[in-house]
Structures are given as structure tokens and as C-alpha cells.
């Protein structure tokens, strides 16, 4: 068995580099322009929750999803961005400077204590192409259990990530199939788990904390 099937996959980017983080932010939508459709869908779903809600984003990157949600949902109580990369958070602060409800937490959602650092319960947790940054899909079950605990009741999770690009050990270790994602979510006690949108290998899943 290939070691990549058992071990965490090394990072391919230096996320401590502001230049590299900025280059990613500029190129992301050029490489996958259909990402905008998913951001729009997430923003629309958050808008249905009503005013005064608290939203947490895991793996916020350069703030593209946060910007779309905050544009659409001006009545949120708070929007908390979590990322382990200070350069990514710096880019987010610049992009979101006009949104006073945005706050920023430098931590890895792979750590055991990130749930303590984000501060309280949230009505909605969102994530856009970040779960694979766990660097191995075996960590996803624990992550979703942690997410479940930081959700209020009722609470909504909207998580988008790529399916495997091919059958290589690297891709199979990093990315989950639709079935694997839904199994991990239901295993963490989320209900009404289903695919909300799928396009060009990107899949948006939702799940609820109802009790």
C-alpha cells in the first residue's frame, strides 16, 4: 500500500508567504471560475437564516467566500474567519475592511483546541475548498464532530470541497468521494445530509444540527 494512503500529504504551497498567498487568491477563480456559483449559493443559503446570526468560516483563505456572504447578508451579527495562514488572514482583512462584523482567528482547524479559540456557538458554519487541507481525509470525521459541537441548535453546516481528481494515492488521500463525505457527516450526527450543488468536481454538502 502506498504510504500516502496512510500518512498526511505534505503541503504543496508555502502559506506563510504573503506573495504565494496573494498569487493563489488572484489565480483561484481564473483556474476554477465556477467557484463563484458555489459562493453565491452559500451566500443565498445563509441569507435564508435571517438576521442576527453568527457565522463561522473554516479555512477562509483570502476572504472570497466571506466577501460574498457579507455582501449578501448585511444583517449578520458576526462573521468569524479561521485560517492557519497569517498572510491569508491579512488578505482577508484588506478585502473585508468595510465589514465591521468580520473577525479573524489565527488557528488551524486541525488542532485540538480550535473550538475553544473561535468563541462560542454559531448558527452556521461554512467552508469552501478547505477540508482537504487536513492533508488526509481520515481527519475529516473528527473535524465534523468538532463542527457539530460549535453549532447552535438549530444549526447549519455548508461545506464544499473537491472530489478526487484521479485514482492516484495522493488524490485519494486528500479528497473524499461524495459517499465518503456524506458518511463522515452522518457519522458526526448531522441530519438531512445531502448534496446542494455540484459542478466540475466541486461538491457542496449541507447538514443540520437539530438537537
Language-model regions: role of each:
Residues 124-138:
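A short SAM/SAH-binding and catalytic strip from SAM-dependent methyltransferases
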Residues 56, 62-112:
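Class I SAM-dependent methyltransferase SAM/SAH-binding core
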Residues 115-125:
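A short acidic, Gly/Pro-enriched loop at the edge of an enzyme's catalytic core
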Residues 156-205:
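C-terminal alpha-helical "lid/dimerization" subdomain adjacent to the S-adenosyl-L-methionine
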Residues 205-211:
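C-terminal lobe and adjacent flexible extensions of AdoMet/dcAdoMet transferase-like proteins
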Residues 82, 128, 160:
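Alpha/beta-hydrolase-fold catalytic nucleophile elbow
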Residues 1-49:
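Conserved class I S-adenosyl-L-methionine
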Residues 141-153:
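A short glycine-rich, Lys/Arg-flanked "PGG" loop and its adjoining helix->strand segment in the class I
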